[in-house]
Amino acid sequence: MSTPELSLPAHLLPADGRFGCGPSKIRPDQLAAIDPEVMGTSHRKPAVKNLVGSVREGLSTLFSLPEGYEIVLSVGGATAFWDAATFGLIERHSAHLTFGEFSTKFAKSAAGAPWLDAPSIVEAPAGTVPDVGDLSAEADVVAWAHNETSTGAMAEVTRPHPRNDQQLVVVDATSGAGGLPVNIADTDVYYFSPQKCFASDGGLWLAAMSPAALERIERINASERYIPNFLNLQTAVDNSRKNQTYNTPAIATLL
């Protein structure tokens, strides 16, 4: 049986072709706010550090961060974060919900790491969402997307095994953060790039991290595991606490 071709009528098409699961259109007010006094400035200078500090403070307020949680940021977007988490957040074994292109990518990163055990994967067809409760109780990291960018399918954010205090809940919120309700206390790492709901540009990752996640990062960093400097989460934490990034950030994205 042949598949019929679907065609949307012109009045239903978005006025701007950038509408979709890609980056959001940036508001004119934000484009006008690009400050020549900040653009092209060293990220070690007060002007940029103050900007980073204001972003961290604003996100802390937006998400009503519980005591001990911190906003951490670095360069490279959520794609870089998957590799950074593979190096510096997963201790031995992770479990993943995969239900689209983006939730699958973190699982692939973990599967390719020879220093980790093979990840447990709970898969569901694109457009549907697997059950968070099916994630392994033995995994030291459980991971999924709050909103699967490629399909729009939304998963709940909750701790699947709350009695396991060694299990970190790591949620990709790139196309959900700022637009979907969340209790950050139900996560240990709620990470995202800002080019969706925040209508910024790409190039950075930001994350709300729990004390347990911060402790895990510090412990793995102190071990004998090799971690590239660019992907070192402890480096990101240390710099964020100084309102900096390890290397030059996309300043326009922060603005």
Predicted regions and their residues:
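N-terminal "arm"/small-domain region of PLP-dependent enzymes with the aminotransferase-like
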Residues: 1-43
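Active-site C-terminal subdomain of aminotransferase-like
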Residues: 25, 197-255
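Conserved N-terminal alpha-helix of the aminotransferase class I/II PLP-enzyme fold
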Residues: 34-84, 101, 105-109
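Conserved PLP-anchoring active-site segment centered on the Schiff-base-forming lysine
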Residues: 89-104
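Structural motif
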Residues: 95, 140-145, 170, 191, ...
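Active-site phosphate-binding strand-loop segment of PLP-dependent enzymes
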Residues: 124-178
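Conserved active-site segment immediately N-terminal to the catalytic lysine
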Residues: 184-195, 205
